[in-house]
Amino acid sequence: MPEKKKLQLGLSFAPNAVSNLEQIEDYITENGNSDLATKVVDKILDRCEDLTVMPKSGKPREDIAHGLRSVTSGMYVIYYRIHSDKIEILRIWHGARDNAALIGEI
């Protein structure tokens, strides 16, 4: 049987998501482990890239905003939307943060 080709969507990061990644890296680095900071950010970016092949792998988060989905990467939650041509990463927050704070920000 022929192998199915997986369609791959583009990937974009909203300014807030870029800022979130920078804050995560800075926080871990400031607490003494720049190698760990790099590994955590790389793992988050890998998970974001996975979404371009499996966009619906995340959990629908209609409780926060229409069309919003989320996946986890370690202790972090990646919030995103699926568009016709790309995955848009909107926020990347520590899992302990209050989701209610997202309402109105996405």
Where are these regions (language model features)?
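Arg/Lys-rich, positively charged N-terminal/basic patches that mediate binding to nucleic acids
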Residues: 1-39
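Enriched for short, Lys/Arg-rich terminal
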Residues: 76, 81-106
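Basic/aromatic recognition patch in beta-strand/loop cores that engages polyanionic ligands
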Residues: 46, 56-86
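Residues at alpha-helix boundaries and the short loops/turns that link adjacent helices
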Residues: 31-34, 51, 96
